[in-house]
């Protein structure tokens, strides 16, 4: 059996749990939130969290789809957490973010595919963080344009 080739040092990613990383993790965990960073096993998580930022993932941590490019768990999701929109907004305030990024799992199990939850989350972020810009990485809502207007109205 051939010897295993080791990765060069420049290719290795240092998670480097500095104070900002630890504080970001504490805020996310204490608000029972999910991030695509951890769910998707992002190799840049240490860098982003180390700078005090994270991409929030709403709608739970179980996706109804099984995309080949994503590491998020798939299956039958839990019911939506009605407190999640407020928890996301509070976390953004605690992290003092000027710009927040929010994505979600696909929720094909819900009649509105999660559009109402998106709208509620955006409204809560704006209410508690009026100066923060929000980047939303929304699902495709199965091409149902009317649902896009629901989330866009927020």
Predicted regions located by residue number:
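Conserved small/polar residues in nucleotide/adenosyl-binding loops
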Residues: 149-154
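Flexible, acidic/Gly-rich N-terminal and inter-domain linker regions that tether
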Residues: 1-66
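Short secondary-structure boundary segments
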Residues: 104
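Canonical radical SAM enzyme core domain
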Residues: 74-92, 107-148
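Iron-sulfur (Fe-S) cluster-binding segments and ferredoxin-like electron-carrier domains
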Residues: 46-56, 71-83
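Short acidic/polar active-site loop segments enriched in Thr and Asp
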Residues: 98
């Amino acid at each position: 059996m051939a010897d295993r080739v080791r990765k060069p040092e420049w290719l290795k990613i240092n998670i480097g749990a500095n104070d900002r990383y630890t504080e970001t993790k504490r805020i996310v965990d204490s608000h029972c939130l999910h991030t695509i960073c951890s769910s998707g096993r992002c190799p840049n998580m240490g860098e982003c969290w180390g700078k005090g930022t994270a991409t929030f993932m709403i709608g739970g941590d179980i996706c109804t789809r099984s995309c080949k490019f994503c590491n998020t768990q798939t299956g039958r999701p839990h019911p939506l957490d009605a407190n999640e929109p407020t928890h996301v907004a509070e976390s953004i305030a605690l992290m003092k973010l000027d710009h927040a990024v929010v994505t979600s799992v696909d929720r094909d199990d819900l009649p509105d595919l999660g559009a109402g939850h998106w709208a509620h989350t955006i409204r809560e972020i704006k209410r508690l963080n009026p100066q923060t810009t929000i980047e939303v990485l929304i699902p495709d809502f199965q091409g149902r344009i009317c649902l896009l207007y629901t989330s866009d109205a927020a």
